[in-house]
A protein has these predicted regions:
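N-terminal secretory signal peptides that target proteins for export/translocation
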Residues: 1-3
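Bacterial N-terminal signal peptides
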Residues: 8-21
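Metal-centered catalytic cores of metalloenzymes
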Residues: 21-76, 80-179
C-alpha cells in the first residue's frame, strides 16, 4: 500500500510540475530590441528602444516600450513580418497607450485584447497573436514625422527563459539603465 501511495504521489507531482512548465511557457514574456537598422529600408537614427509584452491571461496583452531619442512617436504598431520584410499592421499600440516623458525619450505602456486586433489578425485571439510572436513573424515599429514608415523597429521574440526576470533597458551612450 505504501508503494502505491508513493507512486501516486510522484505521478501527481510530475503532472503538477508539467502543468506549471506548460503554463510558464504559454505565458512567457516576449521582447523586442528596436533600432533604425532593422527598419526596411534601414534608416540612420540615434533612437533605440526596448519592448516587453506579457499576457497575464489568454485574452489580454500588456506592453511596455522604453524609447530613447524619440519624444513624440506618431505611431507604434505590431506588424506581421519576418526580419527584413515589411508587413501589415496587426495592433495599433497607441490606441490605448499611456506615455510618460523621460530625460531621453518616452515610456509607452498599455494593454489590448482581441477586439483591438486588425488586418490579418482581425477576428482572431490574443493567443493567435502570441503564436505569431513565438514564430518570429511579428515586429514592433515606431513611426515619427521624420520617418513616417518607421524610425526604429524590432522583431518580437520569446525572452531567453520563461522564468527569467526580463527587465526593460535603454542604452544611452555607454550607459544602460534598467527598469
Amino acid at each position: 500500500m505504501t508503494s502505491r501511495f508513493m507512486l501516486l504521489l510522484i505521478l501527481g507531482l510530475v503532472v503538477t510540475v508539467g502543468a506549471i512548465s506548460i503554463s510558464d511557457v504559454a505565458f512567457a514574456k516576449k521582447i523586442a530590441s528596436l533600432t533604425g537598422d532593422q527598419v526596411v529600408p534601414p534608416v540612420s537614427t540615434d533612437a533605440i528602444g526596448h519592448a516587453t509584452f506579457k499576457h497575464p491571461n489568454s485574452s489580454t496583452m500588456n506592453y511596455k516600450l522604453n524609447i530613447s531619442g524619440i519624444v513624440h512617436p506618431d505611431k507604434i504598431d505590431i506588424h506581421a513580418g519576418k526580419t527584413g520584410k515589411n508587413g501589415e499592421v496587426l495592433v495599433d499600440l497607441m490606441k490605448h497607450a499611456k506615455q510618460q516623458a523621460t530625460k531621453v525619450g518616452v515610456i509607452v505602456t498599455g494593454s489590448f485584447n482581441a477586439s483591438d486586433l486588425i488586418g490579418p489578425m482581425q477576428g482572431k485571439t490574443v493567443l493567435d497573436l502570441v503564436d505569431s510572436m513565438k514564430s518570429g513573424d511579428t515586429y514592433v515599429s515606431v513611426d515619427t514625422q521624420k520617418h513616417p514608415t518607421g524610425e526604429i523597429r524590432g522583431q518580437i521574440e520569446l525572452a531567453n527563459s520563461p522564468s527569467s526576470n526580463v527587465t526593460s533597458s535603454i542604452k544611452v551612450g555607454n550607459n544602460t539603465s534598467t527598469s
